[in-house]
């Protein structure tokens, strides 16, 4: 526990009611209904399960477990406590322009879908001298590397639209295999930096189309870039967080199409 960081909160916010060094103390307090928990992935299985089993609502950070075994433990707690609200979400789909794209999906404006592309990309790890941190360590982050951290952002809308993968082909890259340890030495960096997944999925009409997911920590020029693109025979549309007010679309007619852009406000 970082006592200096904790003291900053207690010194600057008189609304802080409890300050504890053992999270079990929070679980035993009857006046606490919900807990927001952000911890390294290797702690998710036990701590998340303890929160749910204590009857508290949980707002958790992805990926809900360092591996399948830890995730199964959390899901078991959820099943045993259906009264507990357990949530994790990506904020990006709630831009008004992206909400417009989602409405188009729900309204069936795209017709027969050709393909969907969704991704979340960073560029901060392009610096090979950036010191290693826990998200680059398999024993703390997990073997899935960037997919566990960035995956929910790319998968949020497609999964909510019912486009779950029927199969998965993955191209995974570990581009920088060692980093400074912050103490003058160098250590192995074994997690996946970039992942591209190509999946078949099925639309509600039974037609099958490909979905491509990009999850990248090393993507030149991408500063927290999130995007969603849907291509169909009757219409296509795109959203990119680099242009958060822009809803880009085209209606398909004949052999030629033109991309249009409109501002979507709140």
For the regions a language model picked out, list residue spans one by one.
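Short, Asp-centered acidic motifs that coordinate Mg2+ and/or phosphate
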Residues: 18, 34, 115
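Predominantly a Rossmann-like dinucleotide-binding segment in NAD(P)-dependent oxidoreductases
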Residues: 84, 92-189
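Short polybasic amphipathic segments
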Residues: 228, 244-260, 264
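Alpha-helical elements of Rossmann-like donor-binding domains used by nucleotide-donor carbohydrate transfer enzymes
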Residues: 8, 25, 34, 46, ...
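Beta-strand-loop-alpha-helix segment that lines the small-molecule cofactor/substrate pocket
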Residues: 33-34, 40-41, 45-93, 108
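Conserved SAM-binding strand-loop segment of SAM-dependent methyltransferases
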Residues: 16-22
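N-terminal Rossmann-like dinucleotide-binding module
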Residues: 1-14
């Amino acid at each position: 526990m970082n006592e200096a960081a904790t003291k900053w909160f207690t010194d600057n916010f008189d609304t802080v009611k409890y300050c504890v060094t053992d999270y079990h103390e929070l679980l035993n307090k009857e006046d606490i209904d919900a807990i927001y928990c952000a911890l390294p992935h290797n702690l998710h299985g036990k701590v998340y399960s303890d929160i749910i089993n204590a009857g508290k609502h949980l707002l958790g950070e992805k990926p809900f477990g360092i591996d399948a075994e830890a995730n199964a433990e959390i899901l078991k707690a959820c099943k045993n406590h259906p009264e507990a609200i357990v949530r994790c979400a990506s904020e990006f789909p709630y831009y008004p322009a992206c909400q417009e794209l989602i409405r188009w999906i729900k309204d069936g404006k795209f017709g027969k879908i050709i393909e969907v592309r969704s991704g979340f990309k960073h560029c901060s790890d392009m610096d090979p001298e950036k010191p290693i941190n826990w998200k680059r360590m398999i024993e703390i982050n997990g073997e899935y590397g960037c997919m566990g951290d960035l995956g929910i952002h790319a998968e949020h809308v497609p999964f909510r639209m019912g486009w779950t993968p029927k199969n998965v082909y993955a191209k995974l890259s570990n581009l920088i295999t060692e980093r400074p340890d912050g103490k003058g030495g160098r250590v192995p960096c074994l997690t996946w930096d970039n992942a591209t997944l190509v999946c078949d999925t099925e639309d509600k009409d039974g037609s099958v189309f490909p979905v491509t997911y990009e999850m990248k920590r090393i993507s030149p020029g991408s500063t927290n870039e999130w995007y969603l693109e849907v291509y169909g025979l009757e219409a296509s549309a795109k959203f990119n967080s680099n242009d958060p007010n822009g809803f880009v679309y085209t209606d398909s007619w004949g052999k030629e199409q033109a991309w249009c852009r409109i501002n979507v406000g709140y």
